[in-house]
């Protein structure tokens, strides 16, 4: 990755912002071979933790981006989340150890480590360049692309550029660059969103909270008694107690009526608050900040060739840990669609499904986060007592208790009807518009591999005990080849055909897989299908269709229609392209 501000005339995609959303998008696009320029206004990495958690869906995205192993090595996983009373007794607990999407459901992280890792790993792509200390100032667009003007950040100090890894050589003069598309991943105060005139709907919450980030001093062992994530439901001082990897820990305290920002950020007050839970002499306070939060979502996510993502598109209260995760989901949804349009594999209308799909899911995450905030931050003794009685009653009820203990109140990765790229659902359990499971499967060589690592980055056809290729017309096969589709036959564990003439496995042609854990076979059955059915899977691992093999060509015709693909459309070779530079 070239961090120097060399003159570049054009790229495929310009990204404004190198936070988790922008960095994830850069990885996904870079892996697909597109040329990318990322403009990051901060000349050096912003070293404070903000996000502390991500989930299995987002780790699946990081797997697709090729960075999951490096990130998970520095995460704390499978940590129970608890609702705790003021006296220390547990009111309720949420935890799951299964892996429906291939990764732990609960992953606590230290954001400076995560962002540094994402940024450093972009160096593997010669077609991706990060320009630090550069901020987007204006842009214009036409039917062919976007022209972006960027300049040295107004607060940039040239002494900041002494760190070659984190800074760039900065030309103080404005520069312009041409891109096929511009993505504004530039945060809640998005310059891109404001320039587009896109408004946001939702609510601003006036209730302030004090966040205190701690780092345990070297040689100390002062966090052993706080192994879990806890909402401390104390009506006198609602508190969040959050473990993080390494020596880090976070507390959040809700301000009560009459308490001010100046009072609560006072070092003595901070010391008194954290001393309820830890010995303050064994910690360094990395950050203390009073903040309020927003629950907002943008009314539009695309205008022409300019799109917004992450906090620029939605602002999520922190109480479900879904702010960063929602932005990562945006990147996954958007990356393959931009790639397909640029390479002539789909028409531009495909990009409209980005907003229609992601809006409702992001809004659902915002809503559940607000509900969780209301649940844990009750300051009335009467309301708190009623809440505690309700929780105990729910947990004593078998179905509802399981629903709460397993965290099934969190919105599933499912798109609302009539909003998604895919065939309509026939019944409540139809898989269309839903993320497919990701178990380990067994290859014909006897290796156990996560399913996505075999399906790749394009479309996939998975036949249950049937070779989907056999049922494809010539026209269907042509479309699927254009989409870089992979084909798989899935067998129940131990049921793969044997004999000298049955081993047809070829990773470029047909994957013969065994469902070791039984999750995929169960998924077909839940959807109302058995042997002989085929699932058409999108590049982001959502289901386009599930049909009987005899109806497969009908589903592929529908795919062709929804992609707006037609023979003769330009298809760009799927190879990395170096940034095009002025001679």
Indicate where each model-derived feature is located.
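Conserved FAD-binding catalytic core of PHBH/FMO-like flavoproteins
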Residues: 120, 156-157, 163-167, 173, ...
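N-terminal Rossmann-fold NAD(P) dinucleotide-binding loop
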Residues: 22-23
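A conserved short coil-to-beta-strand element within the FAD-binding core of flavoproteins
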Residues: 132-147, 153-155
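Active-site-adjacent segment of FAD-dependent monooxygenases/related oxidoreductases
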Residues: 50-123
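Helical substrate-recognition/capping region of FAD-dependent monooxygenase/halogenase enzymes
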Residues: 2-12, 16, 32, 116, ...
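Helical element adjacent to the flavin cofactor pocket in flavoenzyme catalytic cores
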Residues: 109-131, 136, 162-164, 169
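Glycine-rich FAD pyrophosphate-binding loop
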Residues: 30-50
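FAD/FMN-dependent oxidoreductases across multiple families
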Residues: 244-247, 261-326, 346, 351, ...
């Amino acid at each position: 990755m070239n961090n120097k501000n060399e003159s570049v005339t054009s790229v495929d995609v310009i990204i404004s912002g190198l936070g988790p959303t922008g960095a994830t998008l850069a990885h996904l696009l870079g892996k697909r071979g597109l040329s990318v320029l990322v403009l990051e206004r901060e000349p050096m990495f912003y070293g404070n933790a903000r996000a502390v958690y991500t989930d299995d869906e987002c780790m699946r995205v990081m797997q697709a981006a090729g960075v999951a192993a490096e990130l998970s090595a520095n995460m704390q996983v499978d940590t129970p989340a608890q609702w705790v009373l003021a006296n220390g007794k547990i009111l309720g607990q949420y935890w799951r150890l299964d892996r429906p999407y291939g990764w732990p459901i609960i992953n606590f992280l230290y954001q400076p480590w995560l962002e540094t890792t994402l940024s450093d790993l972009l160096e593997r792509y010669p077609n991706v360049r990060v320009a630090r200390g550069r901020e987007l100032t204006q842009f214009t667009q036409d039917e062919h692309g976007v022209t972006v003007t960027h300049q040295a950040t107004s607060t940039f100090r040239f002494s900041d550029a002494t760190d070659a890894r984190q800074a760039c050589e900065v030309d103080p003069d404005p520069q312009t660059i041409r891109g096929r598309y511009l993505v504004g991943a530039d945060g809640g105060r998005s310059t891109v969103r404001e320039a587009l005139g896109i408004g946001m709907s939702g609510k601003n919450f006036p209730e302030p909270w004090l966040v205190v980030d701690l780092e345990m001093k070297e040689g100390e062992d002062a966090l052993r008694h706080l192994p879990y994530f806890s909402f401390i439901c104390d009506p006198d001082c609602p508190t969040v107690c959050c473990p993080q990897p390494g020596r880090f820990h976070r507390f959040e305290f809700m301000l009560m009526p009459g308490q001010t920002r100046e009072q609560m950020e006072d070092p003595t007050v901070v010391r008194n608050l954290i001393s309820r839970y830890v010995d303050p002499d064994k910690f360094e306070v990395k950050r203390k900040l009073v903040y309020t939060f927003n629950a907002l979502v943008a009314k539009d996510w695309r205008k022409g060739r300019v799109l917004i993502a992450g906090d620029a598109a939605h602002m999520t209260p922190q109480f479900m840990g879904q702010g960063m995760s929602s932005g990562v989901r945006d990147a996954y949804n958007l990356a393959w669609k931009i790639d397909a349009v640029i390479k002539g594999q789909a028409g531009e209308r495909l990009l409209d499904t980005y907003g229609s799909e992601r809006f409702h899911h992001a809004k659902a995450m915002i809503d559940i986060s607000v509900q969780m905030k209301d649940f844990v931050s009750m300051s009335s003794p009467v309301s708190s007592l009623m809440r505690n009685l309700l929780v105990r009653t729910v947990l004593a009820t078998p179905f509802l208790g399981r629903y709460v203990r397993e965290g099934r109140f969190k919105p599933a990765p499912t798109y609302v009807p009539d909003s998604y790229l895919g065939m309509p659902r026939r019944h409540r359990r139809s898989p269309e518009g839903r993320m497919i499971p990701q178990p380990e499967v067994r290859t014909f060589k006897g290796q156990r591999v996560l399913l996505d690592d075999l399906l790749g980055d394009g479309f996939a056809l998975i036949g249950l005990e049937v070779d989907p290729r056999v049922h494809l017309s010539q026209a269907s096969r042509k479309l699927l080849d254009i989409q870089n589709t992979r084909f798989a036959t899935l067998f129940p564990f131990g049921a793969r055909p044997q004999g000298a003439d049955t081993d047809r496995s070829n990773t470029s042609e047909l994957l013969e897989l065994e469902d070791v854990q039984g999750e995929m076979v169960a998924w077909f059955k839940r959807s109302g299908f058995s042997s002989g059915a085929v699932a058409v899977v999108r590049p982001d691992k959502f289901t386009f269709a599930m049909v009987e093999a005899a109806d497969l060509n009908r589903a592929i015709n529908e795919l062709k229609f929804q992609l707006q693909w037609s023979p003769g459309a330009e298809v760009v070779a799927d190879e990395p392209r170096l940034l095009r530079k002025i001679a």
